[in-house]
Amino acid sequence: MTEYKLVVVGAGGVGKSALTIQLIQNHFVDEYDPTIEDSYRKQVVIDGETCLLDILDTAGQEEYSAMRDQYMRTGEGFLLVFAVNSAKSFEDIGTYREQIKRVKDAEEVPMVLVGNKCDLPSWNVQNEQAREVAKQYGIPYIETSAKTRMGVDDAFYTLVREIRKDKDNKGRKGRKTNKPNRRFKCKML
């Protein structure tokens, strides 16, 4: 069974833990208890393949930022979570993305942009803004509500699909380039 290491990142209070717990335990946690770092595992079937999701729910608070490099090194894919009612959390997404790319030393890292708290009546980040940023980054955008469970499975499953795509692409590139290019042939006269 394939195991996928997923990391949930974003500013404090955007609902990273609520999304993760909704996926794992099917219930909504409405009280805010800042996370330092929690790990969850769940077996799921995605596109007919049984797999194990190893999900790291990370600290959004700045005082725990020193821990980020370590989990970014081990993660295979990242949910970049912001709250639709917080423009600041949306602005912070770029910083998380750049840090992930720096730590992974790669331009292409599997990521999904997630706009959470879509059940709230007032949004400070519009759908079009988020879609435009996702398009610039070349990643999918999913709107979620941990409270109503809207889009929760879709966000995590889309990330697994992005990881699979990335592995397929790397596998193809690796197979192509191992033989030297021989243009000239020697002839004995």
Swiss-Prot record:
Residues reported to bind GTP: 10-17, 57-61, 116-119
The EC code for this enzyme is 3.6.5.2
Mention any Pfam family matching this sequence: Ras
Which positions carry Cysteine methyl ester?
Answer: 186
Where in this protein would one find the motif Effector region, according to its record? 32-40
PROSITE patterns in UniProt: RAS
Where is it localised?
Cell membrane
Q: Which UniProt keywords apply?
A: Cell membrane, GTP-binding, Hydrolase, Lipoprotein, Membrane, Methylation, Nucleotide-binding, Prenylation
InterPro entries attached here? P-loop_NTPase (IPR027417), Small_GTP-bd (IPR005225), Small_GTPase (IPR001806), Small_GTPase_Ras-type (IPR020849)
Q: Look up and give the membrane topology term.
A: Lipid-anchor
Query: What is reported on the regulation of this protein's activity?
Result: Alternates between an inactive form bound to GDP and an active form bound to GTP. Activated by a guanine nucleotide-exchange factor (GEF) and inactivated by a GTPase-activating protein (GAP).
Kindly provide the name given to this protein in its UniProt entry.
Ras-like protein 1
Record organism: Drosophila grimshawi (Hawaiian fruit fly)
